[in-house]
Amino acid sequence: MNRVLCAPAAGAVRALRLIGWASRSLHPLPGSRDRAHPAAEEEDDPDRPIEFSSSKANPHRWSVGHTMGKGHQRPWWKVLPLSCFLVALIIWCYLREESEADQWLRQVWGEVPEPSDRSEEPETPAAYRART
C-alpha cells in the first residue's frame, strides 16, 4: 500500500485516537494505570513529570509506618525535656503573682475588675428586693 488510508479507515483511526485521548484524564481513578503508555516507556523519558497519582507518595498508599517504621517511637530523652518545660510554664503562669505589667495591661484594655458578689450592686433587681 502507499500508506494512504481510505475514508472509512481514516475515520476508524481518528476514533481510536479519540478514545485513547478520552481515556487519559487529569484525575485517574485510584489504583488504575494509564494503559496507553507502558511502564517501560514512562521510565525512558526523563523529561516527563512524575505522576503523583501513581507514585508511592500518594496518600492512598502512604502511611506513617512507611516513613518511620512500624515500631518507631521517639526516644524519651527527646520527649521528656519538652514535656517538662511545657508543664513548668503552665504551672508558672497559673501560680505567679499579679505584676505591674498585668495592671498596665488592664488599664490599656479597659478591663474593670469584677465584684465578688453581683447581688450587692444597687442596679440588680435582687438588691432592690432585699431593701424593700
Swiss-Prot record:
Residues 29-72, 110-132 are annotated as: Disordered. InterPro entries: UQCC4, UQCC4_vert. Residues 16-78 are mitochondrial matrix. GO terms for biological process: mitochondrial respiratory chain complex III assembly. It is found in: Mitochondrion inner membrane. Its main location: mitochondrion. Pfam families: CCSMST1. The chain crosses the membrane at residues 79-95. Residues 96-132 are mitochondrial intermembrane. Coiled coil: none annotated. It comes from the Eukaryota. Residues 1-15 form the signal peptide. One of its GO terms (cellular component) is mitochondrion. The keyword Transport applies. Keywords: Electron transport, Membrane, Mitochondrion, Mitochondrion inner membrane, Respiratory chain, Signal, Transmembrane, Transmembrane helix, Transport. It is a single-pass membrane protein. Belongs to the UQCC4 family. Forms a complex, named COMB/coordinator of mitochondrial CYTB biogenesis, composed of UQCC1, UQCC2, UQCC4, UQCC5 and UQCC6; stabilizes nascent cytochrome b/MT-CYB and promotes its membrane insertion. Forms a complex, named COMA, composed of UQCC1, UQCC2 and UQCC4; activates MT-CYB translation. Forms a complex, named COMC, composed of UQCC1, UQCC2; UQCC3 and UQCC4; mediates MT-CYB hemylation and association with the first nuclear-encoded complex III subunit UQCRQ. Complexes COMA and COMB are bound to the mitochondrion inner membrane by UQCC4. Required for the assembly and stability of the mitochondrial ubiquinol-cytochrome c reductase complex (complex III (CIII) or cytochrome b-c1 complex), a multisubunit transmembrane complex that is part of the mitochondrial electron transport chain (ETC) which drives oxidative phosphorylation. This is Ubiquinol-cytochrome c reductase complex assembly factor 4. It comes from Homo sapiens (Human). The gene is UQCC4.
